[in-house]
């Protein structure tokens, strides 16, 4: 029986059990404690580093330098809760509009609706697959003309680990004085122009779900610009309890804190994060070499040296001329017990958001129709990646009925 190859499974480095055991030994099993504090400090230290690695040097160690921002990290129960708290801290409410990247997972957009606000979706550009700066500016101008006020925030996503075009996006946001929320849930360790993703915007968001670059079993973090903002996030994450000897509440709060046990997993994971990033990037190099001679399969790679993706998920596009659809490839690989996944269905095409304003150019819809996510996690070996690439290439060849490579 063949061993299944999964998309992206969690990988334990060994230190996790030590931190968990310390939590049990000291009875710190609540959503605060030494592991929570330590995990936040570990993340903040990492986010002040930068990586200058390119695809061709993917197996080398991380290079470090001082980040442009000093991050203040608050560990939370999920990436979604972090996005929600960013909305709360920006005082987003009913009647407001928030611009959101359309090509993303639903969690990027859902918290906008939690606040009673309206998402306004902006399509992608083809280089990074992330928010189009041109459409972003068009959307801002059009919403101001139609509503008489500017959008309250901009949610930019670094999809599949690929950094967005932050220089252009930040210039637009600064010009209109609109805060940016960076959804870096998939981009821990990715950098743009040497700066860690998640540290450009007013707030950044990370996810530690079981399939992310590191996991806490389920968790997330909000990256804040100041100590005061972090304390405000913590206040709302702990039911907005006021500083009284009894329980008094003057604001609506939430139960969004991360447990000390889960944070212990995170601390152990931080010890192997550089290796995880290097492994994902090394797999990208293998896929790139394998598909280089295949004219109808394109691996999504860094557009230029300013971009350094962690390649959380390696993704490919199948040319319409290939006469072989992504679904056919996915089904063929599934028969070999190899897990793949379609690219995200854009939010402006989701039934739940059918009435939301959107500014589109067809890019994200084309990506959705032509793309596929390939196994990329720490348990995927170099030989696995070579096998997967070979199976895909052979499928395309067989469909054509000739050897055109």
Predicted regions mapped to residue ranges:
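N-terminal "arm"/small-domain region of PLP-dependent enzymes with the aminotransferase-like
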Residues: 1-30, 34, 375
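PLP-dependent aminotransferase class I/II
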Residues: 10, 34-42, 46-50, 68-71, ...
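Phosphate-binding glycine-rich loop
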Residues: 32-97, 111-113, 121-123, 146, ...
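Conserved coil-to-alpha-helix start sites within the AMP-binding
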Residues: 104-109
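Hydrophobic/aromatic ligand-binding patch that stacks against planar heteroaromatic rings
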Residues: 110-112, 172, 261
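Structured binding elements
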Residues: 116
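Active-site phosphate-binding strand-loop segment of PLP-dependent enzymes
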Residues: 127-216, 221-223, 228
């Amino acid at each position: 029986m063949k061993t299944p190859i999964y998309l992206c499974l969690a990988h334990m480095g060994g230190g996790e059990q030590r931190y968990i055991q310390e939590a049990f030994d000291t009875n710190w099993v609540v959503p605060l404690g030494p592991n929570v504090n330590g995990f936040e400090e570990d993340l903040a230290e990492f986010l002040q580093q930068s990586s200058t690695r390119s695809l061709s040097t993917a197996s080398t160690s991380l290079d470090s330098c001082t980040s442009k921002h000093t991050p203040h990290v608050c560990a939370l129960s999920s990436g979604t809760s972090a996005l929600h708290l960013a909305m709360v801290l920006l005082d987003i409410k009913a009647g407001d509009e928030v611009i959101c990247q359309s090509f993303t997972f639903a969690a990027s957009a859902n918290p906008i609706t939690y606040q009673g606000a309206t998402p306004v979706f902006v399509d992608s550009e083809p280089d990074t697959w992330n928010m189009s700066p041109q459409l972003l500016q068009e959307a801002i101008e059009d919403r101001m003309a139609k509503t008489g006020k500017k959008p309250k925030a901009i949610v930019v996503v670094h999809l599949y680990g690929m950094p967005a075009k932050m220089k252009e996006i930040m210039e637009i946001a600064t010009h209109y004085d609109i805060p940016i929320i960076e959804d870096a849930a998939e981009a821990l360790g990715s950098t743009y122009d040497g700066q860690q993703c998640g540290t450009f915007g007013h707030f950044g968001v990370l996810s530690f779900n079981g399939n992310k670059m590191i996991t806490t079993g389920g968790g997330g973090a909000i990256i804040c610009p100041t100590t005061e903002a972090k304390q405000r996030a913590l206040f709302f994450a702990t039911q907005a309890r006021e500083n009284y000897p009894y329980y008094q509440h003057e604001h609506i709060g939430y139960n969004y804190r991360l447990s000390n046990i889960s944070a212990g997993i995170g601390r152990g994971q931080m010890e192997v994060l550089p290796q995880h990033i290097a492994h994902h990037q090394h797999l990208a190099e293998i896929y790139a070499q394998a598909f280089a001679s295949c004219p109808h399969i394109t691996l999504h790679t860094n557009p230029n040296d300013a971009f350094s993706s962690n390649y959380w998920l390696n993704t490919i596009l199948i040319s319409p001329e290939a006469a072989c659809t992504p679904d056919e490839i996915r089904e063929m690989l599934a028969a070999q017990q190899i897990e793949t996944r379609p690219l995200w269905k854009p939010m402006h095409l989701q039934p739940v958001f059918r009435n939301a304003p959107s500014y589109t150019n067809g890019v994200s819809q084309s990506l959705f129709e032509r793309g596929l996510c390939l196994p990329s996690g720490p348990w995927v070996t170099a030989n696995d990646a070579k096998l997967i690439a070979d199976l895909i290439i052979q499928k395309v060849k067989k469909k054509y009925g000739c050897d055109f490579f």
